[in-house]
Every structure is written in C-alpha cells, then in structure tokens.
Amino acid sequence: MVEPGQDLLLAALSESGISPNDLFDIDGGDAGLATPMPTPSVQQSVPLSALELGLETEAAVPVKQEPETVPTPALLNVRQQPPSTTTFVLNQINHLPPLGSTIVMTKTPPVTTNRQTITLTKFIQTTASTRPSVSAPTVRNAMTSAPSKDQVQLKDLLKNNSLNELMKLKPPANIAQPVATAATDVSNGTVKKESSNKEGARMWINDMKMRSFSPTMKVPVVKEDDEPEEEDEEEMGHAETYAEYMPIKLKIGLRHPDAVVETSSLSSVTPPDVWYKTSISEETIDNGWLSALQLEAITYAAQQHETFLPNGDRAGFLIGDGAGVGKGRTIAGIIYENYLLSRKRALWFSVSNDLKYDAERDLRDIGAKNILVHSLNKFKYGKISSKHNGSVKKGVIFATYSSLIGESQSGGKYKTRLKQLLHWCGDDFDGVIVFDECHKAKNLCPVGSSKPTKTGLAVLELQNKLPKARVVYASATGASEPRNMAYMNRLGIWGEGTPFREFSDFIQAVERRGVGAMEIVAMDMKLRGMYIARQLSFTGVTFKIEEVLLSQSYVKMYNKAVKLWVIARERFQQAADLIDAEQRMKKSMWGQFWSAHQRFFKYLCIASKVKRVVQLAREEIKNGKCVVIGLQSTGEARTLEALEEGGGELNDFVSTAKGVLQSLIEKHFPAPDRKKLYSLLGIDLTAPSNNSSPRDSPCKENKIKKRKGEEITREAKKARKVGGLTGSSSDDSGSESDASDNEESDYESSKNMSSGDDDDFNPFLDESNEDDENDPWLIRKDHKKNKEKKKKKSIDPDSIQSALLASGLGSKRPSFSSTPVISPAPNSTPANSNTNSNSSLITSQDAVERAQQMKKDLLDKLEKLAEDLPPNTLDELIDELGGPENVAEMTGRKGRVVSNDDGSISYESRSELDVPVEILNITEKQRFMDGDKNIAIISEAASSGISLQADRRAKNQRRRVHMTLELPWSADRAIQQFGRTHRSNQVTAPEYVFLISELAGEQRFASIVAKRLESLGALTHGDRRATESRDLSRFNFDNKYGRNALEIVMKSIVNLDSPMVSPPPDYPGEFFKDVRQGLIGVGLINVEDRSGILTLDKDYNNIGKFLNRILGMEVHQQNALFQYFADTLTAVVQNAKKNGRYDMGILDLGSGDEKVRKSDVKKFLTPGYSTSGHVELYTISVERGMSWEEATKIWAELTGPDDGFYLSLQIRNNKKTAILVKEVNPKKKLFLVYRPNTGKQLKLEIYADLKKKYKKVVSDDALMHWLDQYNSSADTCTHAYWRGNCKKASLGLVCEIGLRCRTYYVLCGSVLSVWTKVEGVLASVSGTNVKMQIVRLRTEDGQRIVGLIIPANCVSPLVNLLSTSDQSQQLAVQQKQLWQQHHPQSITNLSNA
C-alpha cells in the first residue's frame, strides 16, 4: 500500500518558510475567472527561482514545457494591479509538470534565449480518498502514481530558501496572470473549476491544512474583536509538571531517603509487570544501601537485557534520572547484579577521570567491595589481561569518552584503546557496558555538513562489535533532547522492525512534531520497560533573585568596550579586504572573532557581580552556612598568556577580558607577519634580530624559540582546520588523548569552538557546496600524513626570494612585526598545497604595512581601555574571600594568581607537595565536605558529577548556599548545575541565589529558571520576585515562538516587515535607527559594500546567537532591544493562542472544574518488538461550563468589595457578556474570572482591565445574560453567538471555540509502534505541520488517560488503518503462541511469562 503523502503546495511553501496565511492573497478581482479552454493538457509556467537557487534572478522567470505550444487561456477579468508575489508563487507552483517531464527554462525579457533543461524526478503523492467531502476550495495537485520510495517533500527540489528569496521580490509586470486554482483529474486530463473566494480559502487552509504554528508565520497586526477570542485564550490547563514518585510494580527495598518526583506525563503511564528476580543480597536491600527506586531501575534494566531486538542485538536500557537521585549507585547495582551472575567484566564510560573515585565509592557502598575498578588510561597499550598490564581478568574498566579513541604511535596489534577493550571483552561478551552522562559524548549527531566525531563513531562501533553486551545508557537529559539519543541504538526505537528505518527518520518525525512528540517517545519507552526517569523534588529548597545594580562608571566602561569592539570589527574587515584574504581564511578569522566577542562580554557581565557575591558570601558564613559559587569558565589561558608576556612576572591580577581581545588581535588579525611567513616557508630565522621590538623581552626569547616549532605546527594546523576550531574536542586529533581527560574547564578548551550548545559560530553551518577535497573535516583526517610528508620536503631558497622580490617584499631585510605570534593567513598552506599557494600570503608591501598599522592602533586602544577592565573573576573572588587557604577551588586550571602578604602579586601552581594535580579537585572537595574550608568555587566543566550537598555522612553539615554568577538560558542546564548541591541523603536542602545584572535579559533567564524550580517544589524567599508572576517567565525563548518573534524583530528593524508591537516607550532617541546601527556593530545585520543595502545574517533567528551577540551593544540599547523582543514574543504567543495553534506541551483536562466522561473506547493490537503492545482510541466528552446554580453558590461566599457579577459595556448582536469575578490577590488587584460557557478562567485579570470592559451589577441583572450564553454554548460557537454567523460553520467545518461541551479523540498506549500510520493520516488530512498535542485526562470515575489528541477529521481514516493492522497482528500473535509451544525454553517465552 502506498502511504498517503502530503499536499504538495503546502508542504513546499510552509516548509520553505512561507506563512500559510499569506498563501491565499487572492484579491476580489480573482473571483471572476473564466473556465479554461478544453485543451488536453495546459501547462502553467513555473518560476525558475522556485526550482534552482543557483541562478540569481532579479525577477521570477517563467518556465515552459516543450514541445507544448498551446497558449495559456485568456482571462475574462484581468486585474489592473500586478498580482502579489504570493499569489504568483501559488499559481505557478500549483501547476508543476508531471513526474519525469523535461522542462526547458527560458528567460522571457532578453532577446537571446538562455536555455537550461531540468528533469523532475520526484513528486509527492496525494490520494483521492483523503479529500474532505465538504465542497470548499481545496488546493490539490495533479496526482501521480509514483512508487512510495519517490515520495519526497518538494522542499528537496526547492534548494535552501529560494522561495524565501522569491518572496522578497516584486513580481515582474509581464508574468503569467494567475488562474483559478484547479485540480486536474488524471484519468482524462480535464480541468475542474473550483471556487476562489479569498476568505473561504484562508479559513479552509487554516483549519484543514496548517493546524500548527508555522515557524516563520507573519502574524497580522490587525486586532480583531477580542472578546470572544479572549474567552477561549487558554482552553485547557497546563498539567502540574511533576508528580510524587513511588515504585508501582516492585515492592522490595526501603524508601528513598529524599522525596522524588516524575513528570506528570510519565507518571500516568504504568511500566510493565516485573518477572525478573534480582540476585542482589538481602543484606544490601535490608540495610537500604540500595533504595526501592534504585532497585526498581536495576530490576527493569536486567529484565530488559533478557530481550533481543529484531536485528539480533540485545536490548538496552536508559536511566533518565536527574542529578542527585543516585544514578551512580543504580549503575553500580546493575554491575553488581551481573557480577553475581558470573558476568564479571564490565565497562563504565563517563566524562571525567575524577568520577572513577565515585564509581569505586558507589560499589563499596552497596557491598560490592570485591569488584575492582581500573582506569583505562593507566593501562599500557597491549592486552589488558597481559602481565605488563597487571593481568586484569575481571572487574570494571573505567574510561572517559575521549580516551576511547586513544591511539598509540608505536603500532602493534592493540594500538588503539578500542581494540584493547574489544579483545578484553571477547566476541561473546554479555557483560554490562555503561554509557554514563552519555549526552556529554560530543557531537554524535552532527548538525549541517559536519561529520560525526571519532568518539561518536567509536561508541557506535563498540556496541555493534559486541551485540550481546548488556548496554545501559544514563543521562539526565535522556529523552528530552532527541539528538542526544543518536547512539542509543539498543533502545530499538529505530532500525529493523521499527517504524523508523534510520535515526534520521526518527529525528525528523520527532522534531517536526514539537515538544509533544518527545513526550510520546518517553511514555512509550516507559510503557515497554526500557526507560525510567525520576528527579529529586526541590521541596525545602529556597531561592532568591539578587539584582546587582550597575554603577555609572561600570556602564561607562562597558559602553567604551562596545565601541572598541565595533571599531575592531571594522578594522578586521578592512584589513582582510586590504590583503585580499581568501574566503576560507575570512571564515576562520570571523569564527575566532565572534567567539572572542562572546567570551569578552560574558567576562564583563560576571565581573560586575563580584563585589556583591563577596559581600553575600561573607554574610552567609557569619550566619553559620557555607557557600558554593558556580562559574562557567576560569580564564586560565589568558593568565598564561599574560604570564608569558611578562616573562613569568606579574604586577597585577590579569584582566581576562583584556586578554581575550589582545589574544584575538595578536593571533588572528589579518596582517601577514613576514617573520612568520619565512618560518612557514622553512627559512631559519632563529638568529637574533636588531629589529625585535621592546615587547620581545630577552627572557621571552627562549620561550619563543622553544615553542616556535609547536606554534608553527599549531598555526598551520589551524589554517587547515579552517574554522580555527581551537577548542574542538580532542576526539579528532587521532593521537593518544588520555591527557585531555581532565576536561579543562577554561572556556577556550571546553566551550570555545566545540560543537556544543554554546556555539556562537560553526564555520560549516552555511553548508557551502564545496567539493570533498575542500571539506575541512576531511582535510583534518588526512592532516597527520601530510604533515609527515611536509617535514621532509625541502624548499629552494631562490624560489622564495624570487617570489618575495616579485611581490615587493623581498627587496629589503624583513622588518619583524612588533608581535611575536600572529596567525598566518589561515589556509595559506592547505593540505594539497603547492608553491603557488604561498602567493596568497604575499601581498603588496603597502597593504601589509597598512594592515600592520591598523593592528598596532587597535592594540594601543586596548591598552587605554585596559585600565578600566576588571581582573580575572576567579582570582579576584578567591583573593577577596580569604585566599586559597580558605577557598576550595574545583576547576580544571593548573595554576592561579595570588596576592602575597607584602602586597605583591604572583602566579603559583595549584598542585601541592603531597597532592598530585589529577586528584587535586577530589582533595579540595574533601576539605570542603570536612569543613576545613567553608567556601567552594566550582567551574562547570570540572564539577560534573561532584557532590557538594550537606550529606549526612559528611562532617560539614552546614546549609549550602549556592550562588550562580552566570545563569544558562536553558532551565534544564540550570537544574543540572544545581544538582551539585541538591542531592540525595542531605541534612538540609540548599538555598540558591541568582545574581543578575540589568544586562540583556538576565532577569528573564532568572525568571525562567525560577519557574522551573517552583514547578519542582522550591519556594521563593518571601514575595521578592525579580519578575512579576504574570510575566512571560513561563515561556522559554528557545522554541518556535521565540524564533518566530526574533525573525519578526530582525525583519522589522531592517524594514523588511512591519513591527508587531511598538518599541519601548521610555527609549531616549530613535529606537529603530539606533538598534539597527548596534546590530550592524555586532554582525547580525550586514551592509552590502557597494549598494549599502542591509541584509540579515544567515543565522538571524538563532536565539542563542542573538542573546550572545546583543551583549556587544551599549547597555541601554541592548535592554531596549531585549524588551522589544520580549514584547514581540508576547504578541506572537497570544496570536498563536487565538489561532488555536499554541503548543502548550502537555495539557490537562479534568484537573480543574471540568467534568470528563469516557463515552467510547476502541482497542487495537500493534506490532511491538518485545511484547505485543496495543493502542486504544478513546472518545472523551468534556463539560466545562458553569450553570447559574453553581455560579450563585460561589457568589454567596464572596466577601470582597469588588467581587460579584459584571456585565460587559459593549453590546454585540444584541447581547451582553455576564461574568463572575473573585479577588485572589488584593495587593496586586488580581481577579479570578468565571464565565457561563467556559467556567473558571486560568488567566487572572487586573482590576483596571476589568473596569475598562465591564460594570458591576446585581445578580438579577446578570441572570438572563448568563443563562442565555450558558444554554446557547451547548451547540453554538462563540462566533455565531456574538456575530450571528461563523465563517468556519458556513464552510461546513466544525467550530468548537467557546463551546461548553467538547468531544476529544485520544489515542493511548503504544503510540510509537503505530507512529508512521498516525503521521500518514495526520499529514494527508491535516497538512504536514499539524502539532502533536498530548493531553492528560482524569475521568469522573478516577481513571487517568494520557495520549495524543486525534483531530475529528482524522478519526475514521485512522480507525480503518488500525483495524487492518489489528487483524494481521492477531494472526502474528497466534503464530507466536504456536512457536512458543514448540520452543518452551526460549528467552522470549521466559520474558513474557
């Protein structure tokens, strides 16, 4: 059976980023169109730019099919105005030629015709059966009976954003006039005429096709009558996010020491029955060394490991427990369970070597003292079981992800760590492999054109080579980010015998459907017994938001820094143009530039809070608490550079911010240094030079010589890497990388340009269509071989001299630059270079001199600014809080700057006499836990997995106060950070203090995190919230609404779009003009050199990039811009709600005052890989109105002066609205509103707003209006009630807005196994982008149901599909039962016992 595809036109336009509301831009003049002449096959013209991006056309170019010569039928009613671009695109694309036809493209205006042939090879199928029966204008394409493998979306033909580009153009005057949208009957080629009414078409398209919010939808600014919509703004309540957790099916073990919660969607799904009996000793269970919920995870993991996937691999298990629940002990328990069953070898992978000690502690704590843990990086290359490796035959091998790709230079049979491990395990290995914190293994599912890293490939290979291994994945963000699941192939969600053939199919399906889809996946996994996810409740935790006011002098300094960066950006651009830098060098240079830009301003933001943190920390210590301060980065690299420059001497704390900019200018400013050039060409210039500048102090010279070789190879390597990926993970280096396991916490090494979430820049995201030999990722692979060859290649000095002379550089003795280390023009020596490629380095002497001068000027300006720049935050904090003897530092840096007793400043190593560097953090942690030090400073990279809670087993049981200087703008990551101090088995819960400045939306980040903490049970200190509770804090930015709002903001600033909201009223000056200038300064708006036209950066709607970049704008500007963005986001969300397209994640029905009844249920068997699952389709009716009797009961209990019945001032359709209001917050004058048709409203109203629209009346006056609306809302929608008619109803569609009683169809159970069927039906009936809305119900008789809402018009096709699947599945079950009778010993049989 060919699966129904999607509607061609809508799939193409919506997925190419065109608003569905814009599609039907048909003017009244379009209505009277003639019936086309009865020609056998009339072919409409197709614009070239809609098919091929490569040809840049100023105007859309018609395409004609050959050899067809029949002219387009004339129109009776020709419009006077040229059609809008959208109408034009709509009509053109609606008549694409059939599959396989050859199109010849012709440009009409010029005399000479340029021809280009293109063949359409793929087309989308639509089936007649899925058409709605209502006579309404539909948009359908000619159907072709293409085989299913050819079903692709038209966006594959429309490369990149060609349609978007087309939308910006005005259609040429001589384009083909639009014709009525027609559906062609394939059987006889005749064309049926259909009505073309603008309003109807728009209504139809909105309802039937695009029930979701298109990512780039332009929301009209026109405000409709807001009364009816407002009533229905939030139709269903949000589910409370978390529910108390207790194991349901397993009754062994003691209660967990702390309260644990689970997301509400997961809590309403029950896991499978337990049939596995654990072998763990009763002593361990009775003593509570493993709690009930840890034993539950161990049991389900062991049970899941007894089943096999359809491809023959053993099934895996995913532990999604949050920070602090005790994942470590659970994993230790799984290893112990298998050890007791004679599976005595196990592999445990994690992110840091320090966690090995935790692994040993966990095994010891559960009574498994005899299981030894060995570090992989301590083994020599060779057999692990051999004598020189201590004959290790059993136990746990602990390794980091980066050590997994370690490789020995000496060769031999086991020269890679992976081969060592595979040999140690053996082919039939059926022991445990644990991937702990598996979301941290870098870049397993790469974005754009990049390749997966070696780590990712090694992890996959390990699983593929050991198919019988018992795999356990552990990750707190397990199933919240689908891309993190890239190598969880043992879950059996994709691959053979599942709805998704490849991981990429799974990702596409899930990401297209939004938040809801991932919830469905998680619920399905729990239902099948392969996933468990609990989180520590934050009950008892308190938090406060501490605002740090910026002083005038600080704002002044910040604005000066902004101006310097704007100048720097211009100079970099000018110098690159001067020396005619090639494209790839520029790409690398800008990558470094923006990366440094982001770090510079992050350092400035953090530095503004140091004084306040010190003050707060001292107060808390006096109050008998202890303090943990969280930092993201340490700035160590800057300190080392300053140290080297000063020849090992320092006279003050190093300014990290200054170091960032100085390093950028010195290393990456595009001014070729001839000294460096000579070195690269192999000319020995070690002889001392008279020209060396005062900067090159004698004590530095040796260091420079010593490092010259490294420097050159490093710079040359950078050049090859193109993106200057200095911090990209050591995964790609291909050499032994155990040394890098310490996870340097400095921003450069952990974050700088690695492919993580914080990327401000990825040079490969623009997917330039370079050939493979130019692919920098491939070049990097071959880099080592090339380097070896290069070393041996000698260079003829004469040829160099002649080349230098020819370019005007060789005539004089080379004058050395004032800066010792400057990157050569990157990529000047690509892997396949020949001597000609050096010419890109050698530019005219004049240009080089000017570029050098610019560089010197920039460095001088920086020196002036440096006087005001703040010092390194970490060093300053430690110094202010009493020095290293009072502060436990847990970071990845090797040394620090301290102030001595005599006031001098010096650099000292962090290592101590009796403590090796590798266990320094562990030692510092112990000092803190023992109470020797009461302040701990942790950096994010070094702290993963470190426990600092007020543990019952620790000496230091003071209450922890956790202060964060830098909040991540994702609530999930913030919760991860707080997991350091809030963990199981604590005496007291911690307090959190968020320090926020008034810079770019830090308040908003804080309120998002605060909202999440509240939903987890935390309390605020009093009522001092930085943001009012009615604020948008519950909306995260980084979602489709945020991206859409940002797109509208950016387009309105460059006048591509009209603004949705007015700019902040209190902004002094011309908002749009100033902000435009500011955004040009931070590179989010580009100015075309010749024309001066403004264009948006390619990633202009990337929220992360936007929030990072606007820090580089002046303080008042960035705040005004952020306010404007937040206001636009509010408007976008409100519009989405009004259009019924707001994706609220999971919705709750039946938790409030609604009455939920189950009226029907259909059950279907589905194909499941381990057990035969089933899905149920429930028909649910929900009554949510409020009768007059109920209203008067509430009214009788009201006491407030403003409580009572109100009537609307406005009369519509001879009717007034009656409402009942009750004051809930006298201080803020917030009121709860009840309505006759929709009952209690979620949104609280401000009294001032109520007074504008309503007046207070006595109950008798409200009675008639209340009853009138209550009775009519049983079957009349709001539109019909208030306006007398409903557009939807007049088209024969069902409108449920404002109805008192509504019907929902909910699909529950193993939805994942019928995903493709559901997708197919939703797509064919309701368009490609319909959102998957998850709902949680509690019926009147107490039954809980969680599932997917199926739109009414999809129910009957879905039932037909599931019925056929059900019959075939029943047959399969009977065959399976027969087979099991003949094979009673099978594992599968056992698993179903």
UniProtKB/Swiss-Prot annotation:
Result when mutating residue 889 to K: In a breast cancer sample; somatic mutation
Gene3D superfamilies, per database record: P-loop containing nucleotide triphosphate hydrolases
Name listed for the protein in its UniProt record: Protein strawberry notch homolog 1
InterPro entries linked: P-loop_NTPase, SBNO_Helicase_C_dom, SNO, SNO_AAA
Biased composition (Basic and acidic residues): 697-716
Xref: Pfam families: AAA_34, Helicase_C_4, SBNO
Recorded GO MF terms: chromatin DNA binding; histone binding
Coiled coil stretches, renumbered: 843-870
Keyword Acetylation attached: yes
Region listing for Disordered, in residue ranges: 129-148, 687-840
Location(s), subcellular: Nucleus
Record PTM N6-acetyllysine, positions in chain: 149, 413, 1222
Biased composition (Acidic residues): 733-747, 756-775
Phosphoserine PTM positions: 148, 162, 214, 692-693, 697, 754-755, 768, 794, 815, 1386
Species of origin: Homo sapiens (Human)
UniProt keyword terms in alphabetical order: Acetylation, Coiled coil, Inflammatory response, Nucleus, Phosphoprotein, Wnt signaling pathway
Reported function: Plays a crucial role in the regulation of neural stem cells (NSCs) proliferation. Enhances the phosphorylation of GSK3B through the PI3K-Akt signaling pathway, thereby upregulating the Wnt/beta-catenin signaling pathway and promoting the proliferation of NSCs. Improves ischemic stroke recovery while inhibiting neuroinflammation through small extracellular vesicles (sEVs)-mediated mechanism. Enhances the secretion of sEVs from NSCs, which in turn inhibit both the MAPK and NF-kappaB pathways in microglia.
